[in-house]
Amino acid sequence: MMLISQPMADRPLSWSGLSRRPWRRQLAVTRVFLLFVFFLSWDRLTAPRSAQRRYRRAQWLVQQLLYLGPTFIKIGQSLSTRADIIPAEYIEAFTQLQDRVPPFDSRQAIAVIEQELHGAIDEIFQQFEVTPLASASLGQVHRAVLPTGEAVVVKVQRPGLDSLLNLDFELLHQTLRLAKRWLPGFRRLAQKYEIEAIYQEFFSLLFLEIDYIHEGKNAERFRQNFADYPRVRVPEIYWQYTTRMVLTLEYLPGIKVDDRQALETAGINLDLVIQTGICAYLKQLLVDGFFQSDPHPGNMAVDSQGDLIFYDFGTMAEVKIIAKDQMVQTFFAVLRKDTNQVLEALIYMGLVEPKGDLSPIKRIINFLLDNFRDKPIDIKAFDQVGEEVYAMFQQQPFRLPPQMTFILKSISTLDGIARALDPRYNLIAASQPFIQSITVAQPKRSLAMALLQQVKQFALDQLNRPSRNQQFLQELAAKLERGELQFATRSPEGDRLLRKIHLALKSLIFACLTGFTLLSATVLLSTVYARFAVVGFGLAGLFGLFLLRSLIKLAVQEKLDRLVQKR
């Protein structure tokens, strides 16, 4: 057996040995939580909320999540699907968590394998590579060869993960309870977004994900779903070498799916890869109702024949499948930009909750159909609309079901992979083989009737299409009915007054903070904690500088106002 030394992580990981020191874990989690709340409050106080500022804070938070370990890495990955809760900048930053998890010591991995499979590593495998092939938040993967000669990969769970997750479950539950009790703003947020339910759902899924027997069953089901698809490959599970903490799968090597240069060098047809990926995902979603909810590039590869390989079946999701005739109707609805029928299909599948005002969801569907139906998804266009979409989610009393957010994230990821291979790809063109397979599967009479009905509907839509003036009046009436009509007015005097009030409030807050910290430091001088007084005086000096800056700005603003009034 070949033994290869493994480099250790550069930074000590805070979750190691925590079962013996839970109080240190509590301090680490509390520190990150309080710092994050402080930074958000400081940003709101000292500067307008901007995408750039949020992005910097998101990068900082990613580093902290990596330091806190598996539970919090998974929380970040889960939050990257919640566009209805957090801004786009955080979603973008959280996607970086996929490939930045350091491996653990291979000696620990071997110890887990020997304990779970009841034998020495030399007896279990003919060959075992010590250096991990890949690592993730919950485990890492090693190559091996079975005694019967089959090449396999062995997925090993991080040691002590069970106790760590149980500890974090309790710590986060306590933190949520305290935050809801003492922070009124957080209490309102928790009620609006059902944070308690999200928390319970997250941990129930996480405990399922660390059960590798459950993942093996998912892989078998996925493999059976694609048994008749020769261009899609799914690794076989070796149950004799699989337990709750060890998963042994067939070794299927391939080129990373978004590595365009390597794929071209291997002579692989990129258009066919894109087509296979899009059609495979449509089949998962619309035919099987069982789909991979995290299809990032690390979970897919392309073999030497150009076939698509799927890995990692720990995070799967299910949706209600629709009948083939409904599917045909939905495709035609997309082609003719029928927002209402597309929305009906999403509600039927349980991807949108039919509660409250659905007009914002209609606007999103309309935006997608208008901008991305016949052309590649333009990231710049998404950037332009991202702020508006986030603001809409903040204002509306609804949230998307988890399945819908998984689908949105998956579509976005698949689109990114497709654009990396061919920036000019067309989603509808790539979906044609799947659409044809659906229509061919229909009985001829049923298909003819469906096509005739859709042609009739299209003709009626064209004949009854209102003029531009009529459309404008209809939209105006609809906005009035929904209470969405807004009138924008600007008053220079009002703007100046608001600026002065804002500066005066900032000055007052900084004055209070300066006085409070100065008083606290003075009191500390007369106690046994006198050495900490220097911190209080330092903070008082810092707040004093901010107070001085605010007062100068206020004085300058008053002078400018006087000059304007004289004119």
From Swiss-Prot:
It holds the Pfam family ABC1. Disulfide bonds: none annotated. InterPro entries: ABC1_dom, Kinase-like_dom_sf, UbiB_kinase. This is Uncharacterized protein sll0095. Belongs to the protein kinase superfamily. ADCK protein kinase family. PANTHER family: CHAPERONE-ACTIVITY OF BC1 COMPLEX CABC1 -RELATED (PTHR10566), PROTEIN ACTIVITY OF BC1 COMPLEX KINASE 7, CHLOROPLASTIC (PTHR10566:SF113). It comes from Synechocystis sp. (strain ATCC 27184 / PCC 6803 / Kazusa).
